[in-house]
């Protein structure tokens, strides 16, 4: 199993797909990296040579991936919250940030619904 950027890549997948297991690398960036290093995208991870793996590591080190990228995103959100802008306040309150409606349909961001005790209906008389 090839280990790149602290992630074990699956052995049986094509390297083009396997690289997307690294946080911060999607299919487009994976194709860019493979084109730059000259590795065939259809090669399986288990068939890569040590030279190929070294070239992939060097190419991926040029990007911010995994922990560095997660830390950068967290710092950006924290900066927004510290300066007190609208987006920062929405993050702090756990509400949608990008203008979505909240009267209904914000369940993913707000969490599951809190049940409120309601008025019981009287039993039907016969």
UniProtKB/Swiss-Prot annotation:
GO biological process per UniProt: translation
GO CC field: cytosol; small ribosomal subunit
Keyword annotations of the record: Ribonucleoprotein, Ribosomal protein, RNA-binding, rRNA-binding, tRNA-binding
Example of a GO MF term: rRNA binding
Pfam families attached to this UniProt entry: Ribosomal_S13
Bias type Basic residues, positions: 100-126
Residue span of region Disordered: 96-126
Entry annotated with the keyword Disulfide bond: no
Function: Located at the top of the head of the 30S subunit, it contacts several helices of the 16S rRNA. In the 70S ribosome it contacts the 23S rRNA (bridge B1a) and protein L5 of the 50S subunit (bridge B1b), connecting the 2 subunits; these bridges are implicated in subunit movement. Contacts the tRNAs in the A and P-sites.
Annotated family: Belongs to the universal ribosomal protein uS13 family.
NCBIfam families, per database record: uS13_bact
Assembly description: Part of the 30S ribosomal subunit. Forms a loose heterodimer with protein S19. Forms two bridges to the 50S subunit in the 70S ribosome.
The name this protein goes by in its record: Small ribosomal subunit protein uS13
Gene name for this UniProt entry: rpsM
């Amino acid at each position: 199993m090839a280990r790149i950027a602290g992630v074990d890549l699956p052995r049986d997948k094509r390297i083009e797909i396997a690289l997307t297991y690294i946080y911060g690398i999607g299919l487009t960036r994976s194709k860019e990296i493979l084109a730059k290093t000259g590795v065939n995208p259809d090669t399986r991870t288990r068939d890569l040579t040590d030279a190929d793996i070294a070239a992939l590591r060097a190419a991926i080190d040029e990007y911010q991936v995994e922990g560095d990228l997660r830390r950068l995103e967290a710092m950006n959100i924290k900066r927004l919250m510290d300066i007190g802008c609208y987006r920062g306040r929405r993050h702090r309150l756990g509400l949608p940030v990008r203008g979505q409606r909240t009267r209904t349909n914000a369940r993913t961001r707000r969490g599951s619904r809190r049940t409120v005790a309601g008025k019981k209906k009287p039993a039907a008389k016969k």
